[in-house]
Structures are given as C-alpha cells and as structure tokens.
Amino acid sequence: MARLAAFDMDGTLLMPDHHLGRETIATLARLRERDITLTFATGRHVLEMRHILGTLSLDAYLITGNGTRIHSLEGDVLHRQDLDPQVADTVMHHAWDTRASMHVFNDNGWFTGQEIPALLQAHVYSGFRYQVINIKSIPAHQVTKICFCGDHDDLIRLRIQLNEAMEERAHLCFSAVDCLEVLPLGCNKGSALAVLSNHLGLSLADCMAFGDAMNDREMLGSVGRGLIMGNAMPQLIAALPHLAVIGHCGNQAVSHFLTHWLDNPHLPYSPE
C-alpha cells in the first residue's frame, strides 16, 4: 500500500476546463482517511496552489514551480531552489530567435512583458494571473524559473538555442506541448519528491504518482508506482514504456483508478 500520493495538476488531476471534479475531490478525501499523505506536484505557483488547496479542506504538501519549492502542511518552506542568477540574466536579456512569449516566476508571482488573455483561461479556477512588467527589470537572483509559451515547433528550435547558451547550467523541459521551461539544474518534480519523501521518513518506493507531461518524467520514473494519463504527451509514454497508462483527465481517470485501487487492491485495473 502506497503511503504518499503525488499528483500533477494540469492534464492529470484537473479536467480540461481546469476544474477539479466532484469524484476527484471525494477520492482525495478517501486517501486521507486511509492515512495516505497527499502532495500536489505542479508547475503552478505556490500562491495559486494555496488558494486551490484552501477550497478543498484537505491537508497536502505542495511541490510547486516544477520542484523549485516544497511547502509543508503548515505552509513553511521545506526546500527551495532558484535559477543560477547568470542563467536567469542570460535568458531574460538575450534576444532569442522565437515568437514565444517569456514568463518569469519568483516568490512574488508570475511576470510577463505583455497582456496575453488566452493564458489566463488555465487559471479560471483560482483567479491567479500574471503581472505585466519590463522583464529585464526583474532581479536575476530572485528568479525561480522562466517559461516560454508558443508553437511547439518554434519552442523546439528555441530549446536548441537555449541548450547552446546554457551549457548544461539549467534543466529544460516541456511542461506542455506549448510551454518550455527553464529550471535550476537538477531541479524537477522527481528530485523534489525525493526530498519530501526523505523528510517524511519514506522512500520513493512508498510513493505513487500521476502525470501527463515531460515535466512529470522524473517523478513517474522514480516512484514505486507511476501512472501515465491517457491524454499524456506521446513523448512521455515513449520515455516510460514500462508504466501503465490510465484514462483521460476529462473522465477523472485518477479518481477512477484510485477508487478501484482502494476497493479492489488485488484485482487488475482496466481504464474502461
């Protein structure tokens, strides 16, 4: 029996309309009744996740910013990792050959250089939003991560540019088809979950995790039981071919799987 359950949010726990379904909320409560510790492992900001958590009346640890921060049940920082200031400075100030928009994150929020209302749709549940600012004015020593949002093919070309400029001083990953993230070197959900597991006196073998994108790869590949969403990026399924694929987030597949796991732990699972 797993003792710690880690959940990605977008494309996993959240439905396509970016809300949590009733069945999902009820199933999370059942896990807590079984004394299974919960953690939400997401690229979203802790300020947003605290608001979401407050609406659920659930105790959960928070792994946010794709592993750049870990917060306790009481809201205390258990772990923090920022981008190398030189890396942040280079990314923010260089004239990259891309049409993608740049987004900078630190403990104070989400910052971008122009209004992009379409990006707010993913945050309708919480009301969290960006602040429009001159990105070059942000102190480089306070940056947790930087994201680029745009066309996937354009982002693939941008990743080549970033890799050449970073010289392995940062971790690059796709948190969605249209979002490329620049993270601190060695920082990902898997490494953060290892820190949290150790803090709780557990091993990664005691954990189960759910995800759908390449920023979930390390987490899913390192736990005792990793589950991939049916709507996952094809690259993730190809990277972890030994892991089970469950149903679609639109059908609350995490809840469907966990209900079966709680009620019939010894029977094989089918997403149908």
From Swiss-Prot:
Mg(2+) binds at D8, D10, D212. GO terms for molecular function: 4-amino-5-hydroxymethyl-2-methylpyrimidine diphosphatase activity; magnesium ion binding; phosphatase activity. Its EC number is 3.6.1.-. It is an enzyme of class 3 (hydrolase). The keyword Metal-binding applies. InterPro entries: Cof, HAD-like_sf, HAD-SF_hydro_IIB, HAD_sf, HMP-PP_phosphatase. The keyword Metal-binding applies. Pfam families: Hydrolase_3 (PF08282). The active site is at D8. Its cofactor is Mg(2+). Keywords: Hydrolase, Magnesium, Metal-binding. Belongs to the HAD-like hydrolase superfamily. Cof family. This is HMP-PP phosphatase. It comes from Salmonella schwarzengrund (strain CVM19633). The lineage of its organism: Bacteria, Pseudomonadati, Pseudomonadota, Gammaproteobacteria, Enterobacterales.
